[in-house]
Amino acid sequence: MSRHRDVKNLDLDDYELDEEPGEEELTEEQEEEFRSAVATVRETLLGVPISEKEIADTVWYYYFDVEKSVNYLLQKASSKAGAKEKQNTDSQKEKKQNKSKEALADAKDPLDESSNGIKNLSLNKNDEPAFQTNGEVKMKNSSESDNQPEKKKIKKQNPTDLVSVPEIFEQSNPKPVVHLVVTGHVDSGKSTMLGRIMFELGEINSRSMQKLHNEAANSGKGSFSYAWLLDTTEEERARGVTMDVASTTFESDKKIYEIGDAPGHRDFISGMIAGASSADFAVLVVDSSQNNFERGFLENGQTREHAYLLRALGISEIVVSVNKLDLMSWSEDRFQEIKNIVSDFLIKMVGFKTSNVHFVPISAISGTNLIQKDSSDLYKWYKGPTLLSALDQLVPPEKPYRKPLRLSIDDVYRSPRSVTVTGRVEAGNVQVNQVLYDVSSQEDAYVKNVIRNSDPSSTWAVAGDTVTLQLADIEVNQLRPGDILSNYENPVRRVRSFVAEIQTFDIHGPILSGSTLVLHLGRTVTSVSLKIVTVNNKRSRHIASRKRALVRISFLDGLFPLCLAEECPALGRFILRRSGDTVAAGIVKELC
């Protein structure tokens, strides 16, 4: 590889690769290193408006250095966004000068709408993780000693404003709330299954369902009508795949189910990880039709990777929905064949207990064996429960609602005279009139309203609940997905590095000490550097497949909120990926 010109502040738009006849060609190892670096940068900058050519040129120029490439491309995107923001700011400056703080909160802001852009990236190591909204990259400055707030802009919490949520919760004897994540290979029928369940339970009326049937048929996708209840965007419907976690709720006689329909395509694995990170149980959907099961499970499909991820993220019980068995004439032999293969894999390879793996044959499109039994030929040999009955038999884990509050944010948007966030209470409890603290922005906020598990009449929520909070005294651009809200007195820590225990999967090539990887923790996706401490309790410079290692992981993009796995499992478990492949799962052991 030829040496590049030593030019400061080089603009890669003006840079062209030398193509002189005598230039040295890349070796196979260098080509693999180049491809790996490009893939890592692309995944890290997911959502930033940067072309594939810009990424490749930058990686080439920086000799495959991922960190330098990411920083350069972020700087370039930030410059473009900064120019646009300055123009917007200047045009409104005079109007905003004499407005009160309350009027400012209601003013139209160029950052009002949330987007699916990248989160938690920054330009250099002394900056707070960057985030993107409406295509604009914003930066937040930070220091290492800012876990505690320096000042409060609203009054100190008055205990008389609050009630004892744990006591109220225990006395209310509520119906259990269960969080399910539905996973499986693309086109296995996950969204169709959930849509059909919602229709059967009366969550959508016949008139609305008929409208969806007509729309799907007119688009040449008649069999997708139930899936369209969850796949609501134009792109998802056009492509016929779920691209982000679709959330929905339904209720049986025994439980309330909060459902996350995880993407099945490997391009959207980060959405699957986000959906599974807070789930109590999982439903793994497999397509039993001829060749499709083999393609999704045996031929490097996503079913296997999803199973590994589910167990790594702490899910210990799983229901396997053997879908489309009607296409196999409700064959008992086909069901048993799939059951034997999948159960052997889940128990022997992934680590599920035999008693925690359940199999249910279904047809999502016809609704057979989802809610109730019918006259299908299935019941000539199948005597087990319906899918909903199997789910109702699962015992939800106890919720840590008396611990300090830890509330993970999924989405943020502006609402009239306030800011609205959606997320999940991972530990503790939250209520109206409470003061919350966001360690990432060093800002506090006042809870005006709480919607608990889609119930607008609620005034509080506890660990395990999905919530929508209406917040006052904070701006929409001061919060972002991946942030963790806590009590002002017991804030979550924000760190630059941590010690973790990881378990590698079957990987192509060892993980070397000093490697740059992509860390997934809930909605947070960011680049990290990994240094090996020990491998199987021995010193080593690399980690091979199926090894347990103690490592030190450092964030490359500033400080991040983090919890020990023993204190809050949902916020202390993570996944490591490299070049588009999942390479390891880990738990946080020590904050540095």
UniProtKB/Swiss-Prot annotation:
It comes from Schizosaccharomyces pombe (strain 972 / ATCC 24843) (Fission yeast). Belongs to the TRAFAC class translation factor GTPase superfamily. Classic translation factor GTPase family. Residues 184-191 are annotated as: G1. Residues 323-326 are annotated as: G4. GTP binds at residues 184-191, 323-326, 352-355. GTPase component of the Dom34-Hbs1 complex, a complex that recognizes stalled ribosomes and triggers the No-Go Decay (NGD) pathway. The Dom34-Hbs1 complex recognizes ribosomes stalled at the 3' end of an mRNA and engages stalled ribosomes by destabilizing mRNA in the mRNA channel. Following ribosome-binding, the Pelota-HBS1L complex promotes the disassembly of stalled ribosomes, followed by degradation of damaged mRNAs as part of the NGD pathway. Residues 12-32 have a biased composition (Acidic residues). Residues 261-264 are annotated as: G3. Keywords: Cytoplasm, Elongation factor, GTP-binding, Hydrolase, Nucleotide-binding, Protein biosynthesis, Translation regulation. Residues 363-365 are annotated as: G5. This is Elongation factor 1 alpha-like protein. It catalyses: GTP + H2O = GDP + phosphate + H(+). One of its GO terms (molecular function) is GTP binding.
